[in-house]
Amino acid sequence: MIGLLQRVREARVEVAGEIVGRIGPGLLALVCAEQGDSEAQADKLLAKMLKLRIFSDEAGKMNRSVQDLDGQGTCGGLLIVSQFTLAADTRGGNRPSFTQAAPPAQGERLYDYFVAQARAVHPMVATGRFAADMQVHLVNDGPVTLPLRIAPPG
């Protein structure tokens, strides 16, 4: 499973002009299920995402996670948006191939699972809409953008 994390001051996602998800300071997480992924990859990606220390402490060092933005236990927002294009293979020619992305039904099942698990352990979760044409608006903080990948077995 692939995640592209962006530390944001704020972010929102719109579908057909309607805001369907919005957060203040926190993480925008673009996520993609790959062929062979299961709940195990989703669990590992979420655990890493929530514990990753990419928010600054008082000294300006990246020592805080989205679960503790201020050192007092204040959680940041988590905006989760599905994006199958993260699995693009651009090695051949000029048109990307997306054959490594999970089939739509599997991708949606794992996305829904990922969101449910996030909501079970994090108080501020917003989402996009799976397979929708979305417009994502964000104010990057830093900018800090990190790719994460939990490889499928085999």
Curated annotation (Swiss-Prot):
GO terms for cellular component: cytoplasm. The keyword Aminoacyl-tRNA synthetase does not apply. SUPFAM superfamilies: DTD-like. It is found in: Cytoplasm. It catalyses: glycyl-tRNA(Ala) + H2O = tRNA(Ala) + glycine + H(+); a D-aminoacyl-tRNA + H2O = a tRNA + a D-alpha-amino acid + H(+). Its EC number is 3.1.1.96. GO terms for molecular function: D-tyrosyl-tRNA(Tyr) deacylase activity; Gly-tRNA(Ala) deacylase activity; Ser(Gly)-tRNA(Ala) hydrolase activity; tRNA binding. Pfam families: Tyr_Deacylase (PF02580). A Gly-cisPro motif from one monomer fits into the active site of the other monomer to allow specific chiral rejection of L-amino acids. An aminoacyl-tRNA editing enzyme that deacylates mischarged D-aminoacyl-tRNAs. Also deacylates mischarged glycyl-tRNA(Ala), protecting cells against glycine mischarging by AlaRS. Acts via tRNA-based rather than protein-based catalysis; rejects L-amino acids rather than detecting D-amino acids in the active site. By recycling D-aminoacyl-tRNA to D-amino acids and free tRNA molecules, this enzyme counteracts the toxicity associated with the formation of D-aminoacyl-tRNA entities in vivo and helps enforce protein L-homochirality. HAMAP family: Deacylase_Dtd. Homodimer. Belongs to the DTD family. This is D-aminoacyl-tRNA deacylase. It comes from Acidovorax sp. (strain JS42). The gene is dtd.
